[in-house]
Amino acid sequence: MSDQFNSREARRKANSKSSPSPKKGKKRKKGGLFKKTLFTLLILFVLGVVGGAVTFAVMVSDAPSLDESKLKTPYSSTIYDKNGKEIAEVGAEKRTYVSIDEIPDVVKEAFIATEDARFYEHHGIDPVRIGGALVANFKDGFGAEGGSTITQQVVKNSLLSHQKTLKRKVQEVWLSIQLERNYSKDEILEMYLNRIYFSPRAYGIGKAAEEFFGVTDLSKLTVEQAATLAGMPQSPTAYNPVKNPDKAEKRRNIVLSLMKKQGFISDSQYNKAKKVAVKDEGVVSQKEYEKASTNKYSAFVEEVMKEIDEKSDVDPSADGLKIYTTLDTKAQDKLDELMDGDTVGFTEGMQGGVTLLDTKNGEVRAIGAGRNQPVGGFNYATQTKAQPGSTIKPILDYGPVIENKKWSTYEQIDDSAYTYSNGKPIRDWDRKYLGPISMRYALAQSRNIPALKAFQAVGKDTAVDFANGLGLGLTKDNVTEAYSIGGFGGNDGVSPLTMAGAYSAFGNNGTYNEPHFVKSIEFNDGTKLDLTPKSKSAMSDYTAFMITDMLKTAVKTGTGQLAQVPGVEVAGKTGTTNFDDNEVKRYNIASGGARDSWFVGYTPQYTAAVWTGMGENEAGKKSLSAEEQKVAKRIFAQLIADVDDGSGSFEKPDSVVEATVEKGSNPAKLAGPNTPSDKKLTEYFVKGTAPSTVSKTYEKEEKEETAKLSGLNVKYDKDNQSLTLSWNYDGDATFAVKQSVDGGSYSEIQNSSAKEAVISGVQPGSVYKFEVTAVSDDGKSTASTSYEVPKAEDDEDKKDQQQTDDEKQDDEKTQDDTQTDDSQKDDGQTDQDQTDDSTNDQDKKQDNTNTNPSDNNNQDQSNDNDNDNSNNQDTSDGDSNSGKNDSTGSDTNKNKTDTSNKTQTNSSSIEKTN
């Protein structure tokens, strides 16, 4: 057995040597790789920790120290105008510092439940809160929830800038931990509650309680009041309980639910507090809130603080901010003078709102918040939501159709009886129809039907997209066809700020800049934050230029003439809105009374939107009279005259071509060589769309000029005491013969196709004057002559001699007649030339009359609204004397008749009727 065992053992060893096991080899290899990987990771971890520690140390090495004066005594912030001049200081004088012992538990708990539920558990930073914020941001988007603790907020607002950098965040974490080590929780909470921003006039819980509830003893604050205040820091403007009670109440109820969740209040307390409306929980009245202020730029400053709050993550309560704004104090002073003075025609109860922008960059230079408006009151420049009237037409109708359909300024639109798509008729204030008119004329005269047709041509969706690109923020589902003429429904409306921003893009080659009040912020550590919005292209340059050129016409000869400024290139549009039938009866609105009156206009330098309407007044007046509707245009004109030096112009881009077209041609045709000057129009076309066909309308007139009545001759028959009148005419015509005897009036004696007329029973010694007019399909031709009948003689020889002389004289006169006609034709100085000239002058004067609207009738009372919820329509701001349009006209000319005292003088003229 032993030998056998040895033999097997020997064989096993031999096999082992000759065939190594592959499995054992792999196991040894895996073990080595694992050890190497583990060792490598360990090395990297150590290096990472060391590197992180070094990096952390470097980042916090220059972190500011915990300066107790900055932590407990907030510094004020300074606001500067566009030139860097200080205009206001905010913060320090708006605080009432209270100690933690003066702050009741209900207030502390309301803020802790809302801002930092684990405040008493963490050591400056809260990993649980940070994790929750990360999840919320992942689910709902970046910024959905913040991860900062109350401690971090104190550090950030007292010691650091708001730059979104890793270094700043690391320093914030480090300083928060240090703050927790050096100060108690109550001390940190006291710092926080005394620096929170509630409004430009209220920093800290002490001032806020007084500002919104009239409470100076914080122990008297109720649960619902504490919850309302705790809900405000997230968005102080939106959750202001005086200005926005509904939003404030929704936010307060969220805070109450958080307080209940954290066990700070019971279910019964929660239910009781939730039932109390914000307006019933002791909020001060609007009048109490509208306190006087020593700063004359307070309305502008409020918008500055509001913009910082809404458009950045900068806390306005942060210490030592330097806020650089867009304010032009000179313009603001002038606007205040206009709004509160009596130079523009304001009447008792009238209100107004104005926004003045820089056309090129959207910077707000001045605002008219209202007439004698108290600080903190309603801001008519930024908060108004009024129907825009006809000022919407460039934005929602003509701008989109030029951009997408490339309509020219000459595009012919039929202003005839028309209805909305739902069958409801649409009308203009004058209840008239002008027939085919150009887009330029339609916009300048503010006609409604062409505007609706332009809107329909481009389509609602495209039109709304265009308008929203200019900042209007319309919802497509809400927009009806009535919007095309300014009949907004529901809660839709526009402010002067919105309209100024939209119109400025037309004056800026199609580039839109969102209106803004703040340029930049400098923090107490010297870092800066640029808040200038990015520019965006809202339309093609050809759209911007063509709208601008048409709006220049609206100011020169249309409804906006009162807004003209000498020496300044102005483009702009009027707009008025009216009342529905029920409101007219309810408020006893006078005929022509308007709800709103607008003027929105711009120059190469400035854009201004002006709204006027009736505010609260003791008389209860609701509407603007025709005279009061002029105020908006006067404000614009006087403001621009003061701030604009007239430099700059609206330059035609290469994408636009100019063409002289024949008035009334449709489609457009170029004016021909014979087109009368008063039938020529210079219009603009998108490059590649201009007409190439030359009109031939007036060519036939030149060719048929020779078809004149000529050779008018008179022969006397002594025996029959008659005169025979004859003439030449090449073609078919009807001839009207008129006669005058001895200077009397003309009377028609014959009207036929015959080319002669016999006048019997003539009286010797009398002078007969004749006028013959040929009337044909090609026009009219008139000639005239006169003849003196010889007196009777007793001497037969003398009679014979006289007869011979008369016959000779007749022959000479016949020759003279022919010479006279020829010379008149050669000289080209016929009576007809004079007649045409005078008629053209008269036509031009009539054209001027027809395109020069009266400012007394600048409203468009169109009671047609496609929206059942709103019957308010735009007025077309037209003129009852506007008459017919710019695209049709009559060429029929009246004749002058030249008669003389010669025995016989012929003259001829021609008049063509098309």
From Swiss-Prot:
Query: Where are stretches of biased composition, namely Low complexity?
Result: 848-892, 900-914
- Output compositional bias ranges, type Basic and acidic residues: 798-828
Acidic residues composition-biased segments: 829-840
Renumbered to this chain, region (Disordered) spans: 1-29, 773-914
Tell me one GO molecular function of this protein: peptidoglycan glycosyltransferase activity
- Membrane topology value: Single-pass type II membrane protein
Annotated CDD domains:
FN3
Q: Which controlled-vocabulary keywords does the entry list?
A: Antibiotic resistance, Carboxypeptidase, Cell membrane, Cell shape, Cell wall biogenesis/degradation, Glycosyltransferase, Hydrolase, Membrane, Multifunctional enzyme, Peptidoglycan synthesis, Protease, Signal-anchor, Transferase, Transmembrane, Transmembrane helix
Q: Which biological process terms from the Gene Ontology are attached to this UniProt entry?
A: cell wall organization; peptidoglycan biosynthetic process; proteolysis; regulation of cell shape; response to antibiotic
Q: Which InterPro entries match?
A: Beta-lactam/transpept-like, FN3_dom, FN3_sf, Glyco_trans_51, Glycosyltr_51/Transpeptidase, Ig-like_fold, Lysozyme-like_dom_sf, PBP_transglycosylase
Instruction: List its EC numbers.
Output: 2.4.99.28, 3.4.16.4
Pfam families listed in its UniProt record: Transgly (PF00912), Transpeptidase (PF00905)
User: How does inactivating the gene affect the organism?
Assistant: Cells require increased levels of Mg(2+) or Ca(2+) for growth and germination. Approximately 50% of cells without the gene contain abnormal FtsZ rings, suggesting it is involved in septum synthesis; increased levels of Mg(2+) or Ca(2+) only partially eliminate the septation defects. Double ponA-pbpA deletions spores have greatly decreased viability, peptidoglycan synthesis and elongate poorly; increased levels of Mg(2+) increase spore viability.
UniProt KW rRNA-binding keyword: no
| Region feature (Transpeptidase) | 329-662
| Catalytic residues in the record | 115, 390
Q: Which residues lie on this side of the membrane: Extracellular?
A: 59-914
Q: Which residues lie within the region annotated Transglycosylase? A: 77-246
TM segment ranges: 38-58
The family note in this entry says: In the N-terminal section; belongs to the glycosyltransferase 51 family.
Q: What does this protein do?
A: Cell wall formation. Synthesis of cross-linked peptidoglycan from the lipid intermediates. The enzyme has a penicillin-insensitive transglycosylase N-terminal domain (formation of linear glycan strands) and a penicillin-sensitive transpeptidase C-terminal domain (cross-linking of the peptide subunits). Required for vegetative growth. Has a partially redundant function with PBP-2A (pbpA) during spore outgrowth.
This protein is called Penicillin-binding protein 1A/1B
